[in-house]
């Protein structure tokens, strides 16, 4: 196995992760920076709140497909290890994009793309959990947080079967939980914004 090529591919995937749907659309279409509006997060939920359903959906799809693409590239050349390295670096590139002064999104849509490629059925179950929570509570962040916790638990169980796939569940779940720490604090204190409300 040529680890040098894996490192190079991982770096490429980091820069693919730098492509932010919300920042690109807000700058190209609205001549604004979404990080100055709403929750100031460069993600699909904030894009939905600030610019509406179409932009929110477009943002989600861009961020989702870059994760899917990087997972595919990693798997094609390096199997499960490639998914771990390339998928993880893509998500890190989304969260900490050097092209945008290291101020990106929280990585949910991109992580979803990575994990959906790795294990479609299991991730669809996580998606159903997310949707149920959001529809019942109107809190997107709560759905994301519970999805991340579920991913970590699943990863801890699955790591015995496939170390690399189990590990990426754990790492992406922990990273996303860390990025949601302010949301968690607001949820605890009843100050988090519900979907459809600013």
Swiss-Prot record:
Principal localisation: membrane
CC per GO annotation: plasma membrane
Residues passing through the membrane, by range: 5-25, 55-75, 79-99, 114-134, 139-159, 164-184
SMART domains, per database record: G3P_acyltransf (SM01207)
Keyword RNA-binding found: no
NCBIfam families on file: glycerol-3-phosphate 1-O-acyltransferase PlsY
Protein name per Swiss-Prot or TrEMBL: Glycerol-3-phosphate acyltransferase
Organism: Finegoldia magna (strain ATCC 29328 / DSM 20472 / WAL 2508) (Peptostreptococcus magnus)
């Amino acid at each position: 196995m040529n680890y040098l090529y894996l490192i190079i591919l991982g770096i490429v995937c980091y820069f693919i992760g730098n492509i932010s749907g919300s920042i690109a659309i807000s700058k190209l279409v609205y001549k604004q920076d979404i990080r100055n509006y709403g929750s100031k997060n460069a993600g699909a939920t904030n894009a939905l709140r600030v610019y509406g359903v179409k932009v929110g959906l477009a943002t989600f799809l861009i961020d989702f497909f870059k994760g899917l693409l990087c997972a595919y590239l990693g798997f094609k050349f390096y199997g499960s290890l490639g998914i771990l390295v390339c998928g993880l670096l893509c998500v890190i590139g989304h969260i900490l994009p050097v092209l945008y002064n290291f101020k990106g999104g929280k990585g949910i849509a991109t992580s979803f793309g990575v994990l959906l490629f790795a294990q479609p059925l299991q991730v669809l179950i996580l998606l159903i959990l997310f949707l149920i929570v959001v529809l019942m509570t109107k809190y997107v962040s709560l759905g994301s947080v519970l999805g991340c916790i579920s991913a970590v638990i699943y990863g801890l169980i699955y790591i015995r079967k496939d170390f690399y796939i189990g590990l990426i569940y754990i790492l992406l779940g922990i990273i996303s939980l860390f990025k949601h720490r302010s949301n968690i604090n607001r949820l605890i204190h009843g100050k988090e914004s519900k979907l459809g409300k600013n």
